[in-house]
Amino acid sequence: MTLDLIKIRRDLHQIPEIGLEEFKTQAYLLERIAEMTEGKDFVEQRTWRTGILVFLHGSAPEKTIGWRTDIDGLPIVEETGLDFKSIHEGRMHACGHDIHMTTALGLLDQMLQVQPKNNMLFLFQPAEENEAGGMLMYEDGAFGDWLPDEFYGLHVRPDFKVGDIATNTNTLFAGTCEVLVTFKGKGGHAAFPHEANDALVAASYFITQVQTIVSRNVDPIQGGVVTFGSFHAGTTNNVIAETAEVYGTIRTLTQEMSLLIQKRVRQIAEGVAASFGMEVDIMLKQGGYLPVENNPALAKELMAFFDASPMVNLIDCLPAMTGEDFGYLLSKVPGVMFWLGIDTPYALHHPKMSPNEEALAFAVSEIGKFLKYKAED
């Protein structure tokens, strides 16, 4: 069947939902998938919470090729002014997952036309933005014997043009780790500091000392980011703060570097707390947001394939410090992620982010050729 990609994308754009709450999205996808797979006896389907797995049995399979899309939206008030803007107040597809889903449906439709030689799995994964849905599905055994031998996926990129595909043969996205540190001192009157134990001062020392991690502990060739964007302590001007809470993020291009920085954050927090004679709670939450590390051989193959197409402008790009939970699945299954240009002036997660819909036909056509090649390889 021929899909109306623009209509599908606009339908999905209107119903963004937060991770693991994508009930309308799942229902819409299931309806489209049912229409596409009717009468196809080589197709099986499973659901996992709000996720969907569609498996195409190959005619003479030697491996399973996987394609993954995320399906969740963001808690953002949309400001695009589009006729098909979000009908869910305070929710928006500001990260392009509506484009991702539509592309996946278009690719699935192409692969259904003739039974492929190899098995194929199409994964519609929930909760990329908030709960690392890929990790949750893997740990819960959702894949079973459908786990791919190779996994592929894309992410839209606003500053690249339609026709651009960008990736590299190593790390594409950073791994991320949330950091929440709470210093617990003793409150008191500002006029009697000797009777209190100022948590605000302790947290300030901590913030200053963690600046040495990147400058003195991290290999400058590898790099890393430690940023604290939130600091809360005290209630008014003349009361010494009993507690102080700092909230931040770690970004690294390798998991080894992430573990080193996490270790140093913990050591510094515990050291500062000890020097002030107070308690400290430390929360380090990485979960499934590991670095997105492309398999070098598969990435080289994919890049050579797209480079040979006159329709594709292939870009060998540098890594980005943004996070993506596809990194967890790529830590279990070799594969490749790449950027797809959507040519819009607004960045990802911006309330006015609006992709150029011409990217849809391009993506389905060019990526479809690659998947057909992999299906027969």
UniProtKB/Swiss-Prot annotation:
<dbReference type="GO" id="GO:0050118">
    <property type="term" value="F:N-acetyldiaminopimelate deacetylase activity"/>
</dbReference>
<dbReference type="InterPro" id="IPR036264">
    <property type="entry name" value="Bact_exopeptidase_dim_dom"/>
</dbReference>
<dbReference type="InterPro" id="IPR011650">
    <property type="entry name" value="Peptidase_M20_dimer"/>
</dbReference>
<comment type="function">
    <text>Catalyzes the conversion of N-acetyl-diaminopimelate to diaminopimelate and acetate.</text>
</comment>
<feature type="active site" description="Proton acceptor">
    <location>
        <position position="129"/>
    </location>
</feature>
<dbReference type="InterPro" id="IPR023905">
    <property type="entry name" value="AcetylDAP_deacetylase"/>
</dbReference>
<comment type="pathway">
    <text>Amino-acid biosynthesis; L-lysine biosynthesis via DAP pathway; LL-2,6-diaminopimelate from (S)-tetrahydrodipicolinate (acetylase route): step 3/3.</text>
</comment>
<feature type="active site">
    <location>
        <position position="70"/>
    </location>
</feature>
<keyword id="KW-0378">Hydrolase</keyword>
<dbReference type="GO" id="GO:0009089">
    <property type="term" value="P:lysine biosynthetic process via diaminopimelate"/>
</dbReference>
<keyword id="KW-0028">Amino-acid biosynthesis</keyword>
<comment type="similarity">
    <text>Belongs to the peptidase M20A family. N-acetyldiaminopimelate deacetylase subfamily.</text>
</comment>
<dbReference type="Pfam" id="PF01546">
    <property type="entry name" value="Peptidase_M20"/>
</dbReference>
<dbReference type="InterPro" id="IPR002933">
    <property type="entry name" value="Peptidase_M20"/>
</dbReference>
<keyword id="KW-0457">Lysine biosynthesis</keyword>
<dbReference type="Pfam" id="PF07687">
    <property type="entry name" value="M20_dimer"/>
</dbReference>
<protein>
    <recommendedName>
        <fullName>N-acetyldiaminopimelate deacetylase</fullName>
        <ecNumber>3.5.1.47</ecNumber>
    </recommendedName>
</protein>
<dbReference type="GO" id="GO:0019877">
    <property type="term" value="P:diaminopimelate biosynthetic process"/>
</dbReference>
<dbReference type="InterPro" id="IPR017439">
    <property type="entry name" value="Amidohydrolase"/>
</dbReference>
<keyword id="KW-0220">Diaminopimelate biosynthesis</keyword>
